[in-house]
């Protein structure tokens, strides 16, 4: 896999990182629209959410969104040395497997990430920027998938 274009990623992330909760909410709203079967995986204090809107307004889920955006931020920060995050990302993969997330769902997460970036950046979300983010996300998922494989 080619290395992602670091400057395109950093530049585009600057706009997103100004409002991580807002943009993270767009990402998860899109995720639940594309793959509604993921909603039951998110339970806090044994509480099942009745709708994506119910989940997206929950303080516990908003905390999850913040954490996801921090992981993306770490990937952006380390875009030129993602190997420094390998162990952390594999551990994150194991945690997601343990709560019932299927590895195949990360394809939908990737689509949702690109959707959020496009909504946030508008015309600045060029084909080159999309390609750079796709490469970065692919590398992150590859590292996380080691948590499924038990490596």
Swiss-Prot record:
<dbReference type="InterPro" id="IPR050532">
    <property type="entry name" value="Globin-like_OT"/>
</dbReference>
<dbReference type="InterPro" id="IPR000971">
    <property type="entry name" value="Globin"/>
</dbReference>
<dbReference type="GO" id="GO:0071456">
    <property type="term" value="P:cellular response to hypoxia"/>
</dbReference>
<dbReference type="GO" id="GO:0005829">
    <property type="term" value="C:cytosol"/>
</dbReference>
<comment type="subunit">
    <text>Monomer. Homodimer and homotetramer; disulfide-linked. Mainly monomeric but also detected as part of homodimers and homotetramers. Interacts with 14-3-3 proteins; regulates the phosphorylation of NGB. Could interact (ferrous form) with G-alpha(i) proteins (GTP-bound form).</text>
</comment>
<feature type="binding site" description="proximal binding residue">
    <location>
        <position position="96"/>
    </location>
    <ligand>
        <name>heme b</name>
    </ligand>
</feature>
<dbReference type="GO" id="GO:0005344">
    <property type="term" value="F:oxygen carrier activity"/>
</dbReference>
<keyword id="KW-0496">Mitochondrion</keyword>
<dbReference type="GO" id="GO:0046872">
    <property type="term" value="F:metal ion binding"/>
</dbReference>
<dbReference type="Pfam" id="PF00042">
    <property type="entry name" value="Globin"/>
</dbReference>
<dbReference type="GO" id="GO:0019825">
    <property type="term" value="F:oxygen binding"/>
</dbReference>
<dbReference type="GO" id="GO:0005759">
    <property type="term" value="C:mitochondrial matrix"/>
</dbReference>
<dbReference type="InterPro" id="IPR009050">
    <property type="entry name" value="Globin-like_sf"/>
</dbReference>
<keyword id="KW-0408">Iron</keyword>
<dbReference type="GO" id="GO:0098809">
    <property type="term" value="F:nitrite reductase activity"/>
</dbReference>
<dbReference type="GO" id="GO:0015671">
    <property type="term" value="P:oxygen transport"/>
</dbReference>
<keyword id="KW-0349">Heme</keyword>
<comment type="function">
    <text>Monomeric globin with a bis-histidyl six-coordinate heme-iron atom through which it can bind dioxygen, carbon monoxide and nitric oxide. Could help transport oxygen and increase its availability to the metabolically active neuronal tissues, though its low quantity in tissues as well as its high affinity for dioxygen, which may limit its oxygen-releasing ability, argue against it. The ferrous/deoxygenated form exhibits a nitrite reductase activity and it could produce nitric oxide which in turn inhibits cellular respiration in response to hypoxia.</text>
</comment>
<dbReference type="InterPro" id="IPR012292">
    <property type="entry name" value="Globin/Proto"/>
</dbReference>
<keyword id="KW-1015">Disulfide bond</keyword>
<dbReference type="GO" id="GO:0005092">
    <property type="term" value="F:GDP-dissociation inhibitor activity"/>
</dbReference>
<feature type="binding site" description="distal binding residue; reversible">
    <location>
        <position position="64"/>
    </location>
    <ligand>
        <name>heme b</name>
    </ligand>
</feature>
<dbReference type="GO" id="GO:0020037">
    <property type="term" value="F:heme binding"/>
</dbReference>
<keyword id="KW-0479">Metal-binding</keyword>
<keyword id="KW-0963">Cytoplasm</keyword>
<feature type="domain" description="Globin">
    <location>
        <begin position="1"/>
        <end position="149"/>
    </location>
</feature>
<dbReference type="GO" id="GO:0001666">
    <property type="term" value="P:response to hypoxia"/>
</dbReference>
<keyword id="KW-0560">Oxidoreductase</keyword>
<keyword id="KW-0597">Phosphoprotein</keyword>
<feature type="disulfide bond" description="Redox-active">
    <location>
        <begin position="46"/>
        <end position="55"/>
    </location>
</feature>
<comment type="similarity">
    <text>Belongs to the globin family.</text>
</comment>
<protein>
    <recommendedName>
        <fullName>Neuroglobin</fullName>
        <ecNumber>1.7.-.-</ecNumber>
    </recommendedName>
</protein>
